[in-house]
Amino acid sequence: MFEGFDFSKMGQMLEDVQKQAKQMEEESKNKEFGAKSGGGLVSVRANGSGEILDISIDDSLLEDKESMQILLISAINDVLKSVEADKKNTASRMLGGLASMGIK
Protein backbone atom coordinates (compact mmCIF):
# COMPACT_ATOMS: atom_id res chain seq x y z
CA MET A 1 0.00 0.00 0.00
CA PHE A 2 2.79 2.44 0.86
CA GLU A 3 5.34 1.00 -1.53
CA GLY A 4 7.67 3.74 -2.72
CA PHE A 5 6.03 6.29 -0.43
CA ASP A 6 8.38 8.89 1.08
CA PHE A 7 7.16 9.47 4.65
CA SER A 8 9.46 12.48 5.03
CA LYS A 9 7.10 14.40 2.74
CA MET A 10 4.02 13.56 4.82
CA GLY A 11 3.72 17.00 6.49
CA GLN A 12 3.78 18.85 3.18
CA MET A 13 1.31 16.37 1.68
CA LEU A 14 -1.13 16.88 4.54
CA GLU A 15 -0.82 20.63 4.13
CA ASP A 16 -1.51 20.27 0.41
CA VAL A 17 -4.56 18.08 1.09
CA GLN A 18 -5.92 20.65 3.57
CA LYS A 19 -5.47 23.44 1.02
CA GLN A 20 -7.16 21.37 -1.66
CA ALA A 21 -10.07 20.53 0.68
CA LYS A 22 -10.55 24.19 1.60
CA GLN A 23 -10.45 25.22 -2.06
CA MET A 24 -13.01 22.54 -3.01
CA GLU A 25 -15.24 23.64 -0.12
CA GLU A 26 -15.14 27.25 -1.34
CA GLU A 27 -15.90 26.16 -4.90
CA SER A 28 -18.81 24.07 -3.63
CA LYS A 29 -20.26 27.01 -1.68
CA ASN A 30 -20.34 29.06 -4.87
CA LYS A 31 -22.25 26.42 -6.85
CA GLU A 32 -26.00 26.66 -7.20
CA PHE A 33 -28.42 23.79 -7.58
CA GLY A 34 -32.06 23.87 -8.56
CA ALA A 35 -35.06 21.55 -8.46
CA LYS A 36 -38.67 21.81 -9.57
CA SER A 37 -41.79 19.89 -8.70
CA GLY A 38 -45.35 19.86 -9.94
CA GLY A 39 -44.25 20.59 -13.48
CA GLY A 40 -42.50 23.76 -12.36
CA LEU A 41 -45.21 25.04 -10.00
CA VAL A 42 -42.61 25.00 -7.22
CA SER A 43 -38.90 25.61 -7.69
CA VAL A 44 -36.11 25.70 -5.14
CA ARG A 45 -32.51 26.89 -5.43
CA ALA A 46 -29.73 26.04 -2.97
CA ASN A 47 -26.00 26.59 -2.76
CA GLY A 48 -23.36 23.91 -2.35
CA SER A 49 -23.55 24.25 1.43
CA GLY A 50 -27.18 23.17 1.35
CA GLU A 51 -28.55 26.62 2.19
CA ILE A 52 -31.84 27.39 0.46
CA LEU A 53 -31.39 30.54 -1.63
CA ASP A 54 -34.80 30.91 -3.22
CA ILE A 55 -38.22 29.30 -3.33
CA SER A 56 -40.71 30.11 -6.04
CA ILE A 57 -44.37 29.06 -5.75
CA ASP A 58 -46.87 29.51 -8.55
CA ASP A 59 -49.89 31.60 -7.55
CA SER A 60 -52.24 28.74 -8.47
CA LEU A 61 -51.01 26.82 -5.41
CA LEU A 62 -51.80 29.54 -2.89
CA GLU A 63 -55.33 28.22 -2.36
CA ASP A 64 -54.23 24.58 -1.96
CA LYS A 65 -52.05 24.35 1.12
CA GLU A 66 -51.69 20.56 1.10
CA SER A 67 -50.53 20.41 -2.53
CA MET A 68 -48.14 23.28 -1.92
CA GLN A 69 -46.60 21.48 1.07
CA ILE A 70 -46.17 18.24 -0.86
CA LEU A 71 -44.56 20.00 -3.82
CA LEU A 72 -42.30 22.07 -1.56
CA ILE A 73 -41.07 18.99 0.28
CA SER A 74 -40.41 17.23 -3.02
CA ALA A 75 -38.46 20.13 -4.52
CA ILE A 76 -36.44 20.72 -1.34
CA ASN A 77 -35.55 17.03 -1.05
CA ASP A 78 -34.50 16.94 -4.72
CA VAL A 79 -32.26 19.99 -4.45
CA LEU A 80 -30.65 18.67 -1.25
CA LYS A 81 -29.98 15.32 -2.99
CA SER A 82 -28.19 17.23 -5.75
CA VAL A 83 -26.07 19.08 -3.19
CA GLU A 84 -25.19 15.82 -1.44
CA ALA A 85 -24.28 14.11 -4.73
CA ASP A 86 -21.98 17.01 -5.55
CA LYS A 87 -20.31 16.74 -2.13
CA LYS A 88 -19.70 13.02 -2.68
CA ASN A 89 -18.29 13.71 -6.14
CA THR A 90 -15.98 16.37 -4.72
CA ALA A 91 -14.76 14.01 -1.98
CA SER A 92 -14.17 11.30 -4.56
CA ARG A 93 -12.11 13.69 -6.70
CA MET A 94 -10.09 14.67 -3.65
CA LEU A 95 -9.40 11.06 -2.70
CA GLY A 96 -8.36 10.41 -6.29
CA GLY A 97 -5.86 13.23 -5.91
CA LEU A 98 -4.26 11.42 -2.99
CA ALA A 99 -3.30 8.57 -5.31
CA SER A 100 -1.39 11.04 -7.46
CA MET A 101 0.60 12.06 -4.36
CA GLY A 102 1.90 8.55 -3.88
CA ILE A 103 -0.74 7.03 -1.61
CA LYS A 104 -2.17 3.92 -3.24
From Swiss-Prot:
Which GO-annotated molecular functions does the record name? DNA binding
The record's subcellular locations are: Cytoplasm, Nucleoid
- Major subcellular site: cytoplasm
Tell me which UniProt keywords the record has, alphabetically.
Cytoplasm, DNA-binding
Residues covered by region (Disordered):
16-38
The answer to keyword ATP-binding applying to this record is no
InterPro entries membership: YbaB-like_sf, YbaB/EbfC
| Source domain of life | Bacteria
Q: Where is the composition biased (Basic and acidic residues)?
A: 16-34
Family matches, as Gene3D superfamilies: Nucleoid-associated protein YbaB-like domain
Q: Does the keyword Cytoplasm apply?
A: yes
The terms describing its cellular component in GO are: bacterial nucleoid; cytosol
Extract the PANTHER family matched here.
NUCLEOID-ASSOCIATED PROTEIN YBAB (PTHR33449:SF1)
Task: Tell me the function of this protein.
Answer: Binds to DNA and alters its conformation. May be involved in regulation of gene expression, nucleoid organization and DNA protection.
The entry assigns this protein to a family as follows: Belongs to the YbaB/EbfC family.
Q: Subunit notes for this chain? A: Homodimer.
Q: What is this protein called?
A: Nucleoid-associated protein Ccon26_18480
